Amino acid sequence: HPSNSYIYLYGDMNMEEKLRWLDEKYLSDFENEPVDSEIHLQKPFTEMKEVVQEYSIASEESEEDNTYLSYNKVISTTLDEKLYLAFEILDYALLSAPGAPLKKALLDAGVGKDISGSYDNGVYQPIFSVISKNANVEQKEEFVRVIEDTLKDIVKNGINKKALRAGINYHEFRFREADFGNYPRGLMYGLQLFDSWLYDETKPFIH
């Protein structure tokens, strides 16, 4: 039912003509219905949760150095536009930029052989993740300790300004170029609208 739909138009067009067509060919066939589609905040954990999942490996593979460790934190909501952008930049500066401090700390500690990060801001409550690949399950406590000690040190002493500037420049270039590879630009703009529009109908353009 269109009462529970989101419609966006992209491109150089006669907007009045397109809106009239939508009304005549589609929307006018329906009565407006109230829809309660509000997504509520998840109740926060009182303590850190540990989740263990198994995955298949080949019979000739060893379980040694074949564990994935993941550290995940909820970061406010996607309606906080400053944090939304800040964590996109921090994700790059901490885990992707040359000499990224969090990545370097984990590699220097020998916790895994490949370190990556992600900031999933396509959900109401974005999730910042640090992932260690080719680690071992007995390293999980050290994994958490290194992450938290490194972040506390960065909070106390500051982050490398060059890394932070590189993150800002990287995202500025990406925004200016609006290059989405093989994906149509209009489609990607629409998907980005949903990062906030789904949770507050008055804020479709904050990102």
Predicted ranges, named:
Residues 49-57:
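Short amphipathic
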Residues 1-47, 59-87, 92-207:
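Charge-rich, well-structured scaffold segments of protease-associated domains
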